[in-house]
């Protein structure tokens, strides 16, 4: 994002070209468009897909909104459509599955308030802006209300159980996992 802000501040064509290339790479190469990880992104090490980390935050629409709104690129619109409901991938790919016992959970998955839920919000906000579909606005509001119920609200800690179908969050304490 910092490259886009640098371009907006400077108007420098070189910075635009660099930010555009990074956005295109990240949206096309680092995001799964088919298969069991569709809607997720993969960090990469020395070679692409070298990391077992498959997460929504790597694919989130927020990384590419500047390019979309500056150019109207239809391909990015297609990618945003792929991502707008990617919370459902959390049913199969719980980002905190290695840290919590499934049998003790109330909701079927987890979402950290920072890297997971905020990434989903980025997708929902983009879907709401582009299509004025109130469902995406409601998903954001549901999560905000749930976070407000945590003892210290947003600063309570990052770990929440998450229901991808209702988009509700359930605070589970300050375990600092993930």
What are these regions (language model features)?
Residues 1-178:
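Glycan-recognition and catalytic cores of secretory/periplasmic carbohydrate-active enzymes
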